[in-house]
Amino acid sequence: MRRTLYRLMIELTNGRFTSYILRKFAQSRLSSIIIPSYVKVFQINQDEMEKGLKEYRTLHELFTRKLKEGKRSIDTDASSIVSPVDGVFADYGPIEDAKTFDIKGKRYSIVDMLGNEERAQRYAGGTYMVIYLSPSHYHRIHSPLSGSVTERFVLGRKSYPVNAAGMEYGKEPLSKNYRSVTEVNSDGEHMALVKVGAMFVNSIELLHERDTVQKGEEMAYFTFGSTVVLLFEKDMIEVVQELKSGQELRLGEKIATRLAHK
């Protein structure tokens, strides 16, 4: 019953009109009135902001803010995989040979997430990692490794919450929501960076258009908090053992090690 009621309420409020109104408000000068309250409620660290608080003219500008130079360092070890965002580490684990994985008691299909069987097959037997971005986090997304961009594509039309309630009662939001995917070939092995849209505000803006990408390079930004899913091929990485669900991560922090292949 809870699941049914939850989904009904989301469907009734999560329409194009609602999304349009919220987006227009966030981009308007009128939204600047609530910026101080927003910063206070979500405890945003003003010392890290590239600009002073009064220089942000709209909520959208605050959502997509940059950091001051030097506030994040990218792990330089050639074998390291780094966190592409500031966020909360949600989970990691194996991708089954059936191209599925389980998180929070819900099974997700990589075929659904990536749109077809051919893409999903690359990651059978591999590893997934999920990082959640709240409204308080820095919303820009960077590359976790260096390599060649092999594909960029967008899937899904609407987005549902990716918070605790959304993960429990929603319709597989990580693989059904509006999402933007970038696949990178790094030394012959593939990684998929899946940027999952948030409810009401689907917008994910791509900033990187070149054929190659460097570890730590800026790739995109969310216009609100959301989630990033990383998919790695089989035997490509070993996740840092100290990582725990609920742990805060910072952009550039080492989250996994590339496995050496003879």
Swiss-Prot record:
Binds 1 pyruvoyl group covalently per subunit. InterPro entries: PS_Dcarbxylase, PSD-B, PSD_type1_pro. Keywords: Cell membrane, Decarboxylase, Lipid biosynthesis, Lipid metabolism, Lyase, Membrane, Phospholipid biosynthesis, Phospholipid metabolism, Pyruvate, Zymogen. It is an enzyme of class 4 (lyase). The active site is at 86 (charge relay system), 142 (charge relay system), 226 (charge relay system), 226 (schiff-base intermediate with substrate). Pathway: Phospholipid metabolism; phosphatidylethanolamine biosynthesis; phosphatidylethanolamine from CDP-diacylglycerol: step 2/2. GO terms for biological process: phosphatidylethanolamine biosynthetic process. It catalyses: a 1,2-diacyl-sn-glycero-3-phospho-L-serine + H(+) = a 1,2-diacyl-sn-glycero-3-phosphoethanolamine + CO2. It is found in: Cell membrane. Its main location: membrane. Catalyzes the formation of phosphatidylethanolamine (PtdEtn) from phosphatidylserine (PtdSer). Belongs to the phosphatidylserine decarboxylase family. PSD-B subfamily. Prokaryotic type I sub-subfamily. This is Phosphatidylserine decarboxylase proenzyme. It comes from Bacillus thuringiensis subsp. konkukian (strain 97-27). The gene is psd.
